[in-house]
């Protein structure tokens, strides 16, 4: 059984691990447990994976009357979801239960630990999530993606495995998908990407940078995010985009494009960093300031420390600062090569296999 919910950062590592278990012929059956409202309720069934739900919600940080009422309801739901989770576990009879984050994994993993079923949690970020911090005292093993997070868990349980998403993309090779966007397949290309929903600050920086980028030899593939596409289109209505620039709302099967890139500009989410380090792609990271515990900044700093990435704090992001960073990268081939080498060294390309080894030690 496996559970990870709420965001793609919790879901995709779980799916990557399931895929690897299937590839190695180690999976007789799998049940994914999520919530009805989370992204997993659509993504997981679309992969042909058995899916069941628990009713659970997160805690409110504000302690006003509404927050207190919500938190009391959360405690009530947590207690009832443990009962439901125990029933699921007894019916499915798993050899191991794995949690990749999100509130729903808290109920399932806690229930599994009480039933003495082997348990593992996976922490994708360099700052531990609330659910994983809670579960760490109950589970058998804690798999981590960043060495720096190890001191936030009981040391005797911690195993550095990396993020399963890394192994999923590690074998990908250039495939000339850039031609789909009207770009040359033999010119150095950077992708600017604000995450699956896009990022207004990154979009604005690109808009402001277009006059400068039009004059550059390198190519830019800009992904605005579907929800922001029309606004960006309107902002660029009177601006010419030269042939070295391409602008799209989204890219289907994004990992396929990555091997054709010489650099990436984007957020510092755990899944993105797992992918770019697995492939050895230099990056300019703009951590989202809107995430819990500022974990994206901590994620980014782990790569900056290894000289595998550059960092632009969002308040310092402008069209000019973006182009300056890109010019530094593309006009200094030795720096670009060194960053690519450092990025690849930082990646853990056998992450799923490492987690499978951990599974085999506890079942």
Curated annotation (Swiss-Prot):
Its EC number is 2.4.1.227. GO terms for molecular function: undecaprenyldiphospho-muramoylpentapeptide beta-N-acetylglucosaminyltransferase activity. It is a peripheral membrane protein. UDP-N-acetyl-alpha-D-glucosamine binds at residues 7-9, 125, 196, 251, 296. InterPro entries: GlcNAc_MurG (IPR006009), Glyco_trans_28_C (IPR007235), GlycoTrans_28_N (IPR004276). It catalyses: Mur2Ac(oyl-L-Ala-gamma-D-Glu-L-Lys-D-Ala-D-Ala)-di-trans,octa-cis-undecaprenyl diphosphate + UDP-N-acetyl-alpha-D-glucosamine = beta-D-GlcNAc-(1->4)-Mur2Ac(oyl-L-Ala-gamma-D-Glu-L-Lys-D-Ala-D-Ala)-di-trans,octa-cis-undecaprenyl diphosphate + UDP + H(+). SUPFAM superfamilies: UDP-Glycosyltransferase/glycogen phosphorylase. GO terms for biological process: carbohydrate metabolic process; cell division; cell wall organization; lipid glycosylation; peptidoglycan biosynthetic process; regulation of cell shape. Pathway: Cell wall biogenesis; peptidoglycan biosynthesis. The keyword Cell cycle applies. Keywords: Cell cycle, Cell division, Cell membrane, Cell shape, Cell wall biogenesis/degradation, Glycosyltransferase, Membrane, Peptidoglycan synthesis, Transferase. It is found in: Cell membrane. GO terms for cellular component: plasma membrane. The keyword Glycosyltransferase applies. It comes from the Bacteria. Belongs to the glycosyltransferase 28 family. MurG subfamily. Cell wall formation. Catalyzes the transfer of a GlcNAc subunit on undecaprenyl-pyrophosphoryl-MurNAc-pentapeptide (lipid intermediate I) to form undecaprenyl-pyrophosphoryl-MurNAc-(pentapeptide)GlcNAc (lipid intermediate II). This is UDP-N-acetylglucosamine--N-acetylmuramyl-(pentapeptide) pyrophosphoryl-undecaprenol N-acetylglucosamine transferase. It comes from Latilactobacillus sakei subsp. sakei (strain 23K). The lineage of its organism: Bacteria, Bacillati, Bacillota, Bacilli, Lactobacillales. The gene is murG.
């Amino acid at each position: 059984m496996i559970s990870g919910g709420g965001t793609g950062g919790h879901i995709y590592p779980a799916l990557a691990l399931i895929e690897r278990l299937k590839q190695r012929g180690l999976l007789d059956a799998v049940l994914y447990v999520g919530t009805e409202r989370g992204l997993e309720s659509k993504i997981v069934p679309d992969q042909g994976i058995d899916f069941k739900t628990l009713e659970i919600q997160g805690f409110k940080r504000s302690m006003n009357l509404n927050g207190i009422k919500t938190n009391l309801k959360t405690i009530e739901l947590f207690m009832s979801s443990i009962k439901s989770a125990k029933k699921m576990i007894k019916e499915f009879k798993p050899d191991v239960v794995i949690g990749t984050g999100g509130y729903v994994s808290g109920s399932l993993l806690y229930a599994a630990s009480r039933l003495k079923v082997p348990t593992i949690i996976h922490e994708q970020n360099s700052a531990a999530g609330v659910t994983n911090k809670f579960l760490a005292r109950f589970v058998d093993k804690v798999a981590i993606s960043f060495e720096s997070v190890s001191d936030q868990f009981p040391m005797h349980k911690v195993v550095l495995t990396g993020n399963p998403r890394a192994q999923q993309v590690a074998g990908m090779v250039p495939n000339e998908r850039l031609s789909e966007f009207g770009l040359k397949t033999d010119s150095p290309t950077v992708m600017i990407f604000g995450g699956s929903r896009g990022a207004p600050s990154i979009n604005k920086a690109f808009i402001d940078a277009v006059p400068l980028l039009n004059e550059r030899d390198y190519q830019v593939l800009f992904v605005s995010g579907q929800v922001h596409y029309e606004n960006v289109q309107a902002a660029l209505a009177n601006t010419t985009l030269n042939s070295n620039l391409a602008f799209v709302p989204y890219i289907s099967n994004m990992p396929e494009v990555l091997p054709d890139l010489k650099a990436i500009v984007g957020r510092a989410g755990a899944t993105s960093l797992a992918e770019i380090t697995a492939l050895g792609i230099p990056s300019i990271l703009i951590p989202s300031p809107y995430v819990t515990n500022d974990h994206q900044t901590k994620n980014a700093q782990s790569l900056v420390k290894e000289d595998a990435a550059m960092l632009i704090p969002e308040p310092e992001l402008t069209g000019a600062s973006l182009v300056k960073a890109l010019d530094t990268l593309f006009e200094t081939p030795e720096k670009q090569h060194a960053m690519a080498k450092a990025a690849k060294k930082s990646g853990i390309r056998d992450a799923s296999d490492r987690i499978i080894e951990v599974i085999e030690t506890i079942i």
